[in-house]
Amino acid sequence: MIQGTYYKEWSTVLGREMEFKVYGHAGVPVLALPARGGRFYDWENNGMPDAIAQLLNEGKVQLFCADAMDGEGLLNGDLPQRRRAELQEKYFVYLTAELAPRILTLNNAKKGTRIWTAGVDLGAYHAVHCRLRRPTLFAGAVGMGGIYDLTRFWGTDSDDMVLRCAPLAYLQENGIANKPALAKAEENLSLIHISEPTRLGMI
């Protein structure tokens, strides 16, 4: 059985500790996101590290299994739509502005290295969402059984922050479907409480 290295580190964006586990010692960095209601250890419990043991042992791939917080935001029906979208955006910023740089450090990545993302169910949504909004940071995404239409969870995508989190709302075949609305959403950074907002980048 492949043994991973466990980490529990403080997230300034989320104001809490977040857990993740790393498998392998080198290779292409892959950020793995859990399914709906899942945790970082689900990938190990379902045998994924063992399934790619050869790639991990040969230093071709390094797997980083992140934790999720869907139950607190996206799936929390007790919160209003806007607040759920705000929490989802904070999680996105955690993945892209905090965890991704940490992954590249642990990977001893060369300058310019980009991360791959992978996920199942809502994890696929997070994986693809990260790739679409931060293509300079993520090389590609593998979404398995993904849920990309978030209206089933929080209704229409009329709110600017909701739009910012919904791939089917902000993209069409040839690019961004509603550029003015998305531009407005990207300007709305006051809800993300980090000391260096410029680190977030823009879509």
Which residues make up each language-model segment?
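Non-catalytic cap/lid and distal C-terminal segments of serine-dependent acyl enzymes
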Residues: 1-191, 195, 199
